[in-house]
A protein has these predicted regions:
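N-terminal export/targeting and maturation segments
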Residues: 5-68
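Extracytosolic and intramembrane catalytic regions of membrane-associated proteins
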Residues: 42-157
């Protein structure tokens, strides 16, 4: 009976307060793996000035990110929508459109999820920030994503 009591106290003190954190993290990781990602609806053809002679794009900086001036001239990434995906687990869904600046046509959408943590983290942490799906982090995402959006114009090939 001492063992059963000890297990009961363990469950009450540790498992119950953190159960929603554990289940929420599992669900969040599932959403990131199955529903988050990029949808490209339309590509943009760019003239020869944007391409090296070997066909590589000139619009990435040395760190692998899109050049700021190119981004400002060609794209509008405003208008992201955030909706509550799961109230039980405090998970939001963020859909970010990528539009051609001149026409405002939606070229692509990036969908990710934000996890705000379990009850204890949300209510007891003074500076709670959300975790987001990791696929959008770093220059490899930037290079891969924007390389899907832009291609050489027929005359540039």
């Amino acid at each position: 009976t001492k063992i059963a009591g000890g297990v009961g106290i363990f469950l009450l003190v540790f498992l119950v307060p953190f159960a929603d954190e554990i289940a929420g993290r599992i669900y969040f990781n599932h959403l990131c793996a199955t529903e988050a990602g990029v949808k490209v609806y339309q590509t943009v053809e760019l003239p020869t000035e944007y391409w090296e002679t070997d066909g590589k794009p000139k619009f990435f900086n040395k760190h692998g990110y899109l050049e700021h001036n190119f981004w400002v001239k060609e794209l509008d990434e405003s208008g992201a929508r955030v909706v509550r995906h799961s109230s039980i687990f405090a998970i939001d869904k963020r859909i970010s459109p990528v539009k051609e600046r001149s026409s405002q046509k939606v070229l692509a959408e990036v969908t990710t999820f934000l996890y705000w943590g379990g009850w204890m983290r949300r209510n007891l942490s003074p500076h709670n920030t959300a975790s987001s799906c990791k696929f959008t982090e770093g220059p490899s995402f930037s290079r891969s994503f924007y390389s899907q959006l832009f291609k050489p114009a027929a005359s540039a090939k």
